[in-house]
């Protein structure tokens, strides 16, 4: 009897969660079309087509140019990006949008995860957390299927939370293309 009550309670909350996810936001908008620069976000560990050492140098120069406290983490970023088969430019683009590459972040959280209520011991730990979240969580399944940045951001920073999703996508693509 007790197990049956628990089952019904869990089933109720699960159906509520699914329903709220389905009906959240304005579904009349068309997703932003993929561009060549972001088309392979989940498909290629080295999206730039250059060697990993050249990617490392490019990341180091980018972080130095922006005076980022994330400087020195290039190896970890490339390793984690390769391990989870996610474009490192996506991670850096989100970090730039959310915290100016860690300058406005808190507790080694350059991605604004949980509105900074979640802290990390290092930027490397934050990279791995976000890479794993994006590549494993059911919330991002649409994005993994399409590779469309809009499908990622409409969940990562939804309009229902006050986010300007279209602007976020536009800026994210711009940041990614800088790399």
Regions found by a protein language model. Give the residues of each.
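Peptidoglycan-targeting cell-wall enzymes and recognition modules
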Residues: 42-63, 69, 90-147
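Non-catalytic cell-wall polysaccharide-engagement segments
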Residues: 1-33, 117-179
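Cell-wall glycan-active module
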Residues: 1-84, 174-179
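A short structural micro-motif
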Residues: 83, 100-101, 158-159
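Helix N-cap / loop-to-helix initiation motif
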Residues: 86-88
């Amino acid at each position: 009897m007790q197990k049956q009550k628990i089952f019904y309670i869990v089933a109720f909350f699960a159906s509520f969660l699914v329903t709220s996810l389905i009906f959240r936001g304005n579904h009349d908008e068309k997703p932003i079309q993929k561009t060549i620069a972001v088309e392979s976000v989940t498909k290629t560990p080295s999206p730039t087509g250059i060697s990993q050492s050249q990617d490392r140098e490019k990341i180091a120069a980018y972080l130095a140019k922006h005076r980022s406290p994330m400087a020195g983490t290039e190896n970890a970023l490339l390793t984690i990006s390769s391990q989870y088969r996610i474009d490192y430019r996506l991670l850096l683009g989100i970090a730039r949008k959310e915290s100016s590459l860690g300058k406005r972040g808190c507790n080694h959280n350059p991605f604004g995860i949980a509105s900074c209520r979640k802290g990390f011991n290092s930027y490397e730990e934050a990279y791995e957390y976000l890479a794993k979240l994006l590549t494993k969580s059911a919330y991002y399944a649409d994005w993994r299927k399409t590779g469309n940045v809009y499908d990622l951001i409409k969940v990562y920073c939804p309009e229902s939370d006050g986010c300007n999703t279209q602007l976020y996508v536009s800026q994210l693509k711009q940041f990614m293309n800088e790399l």
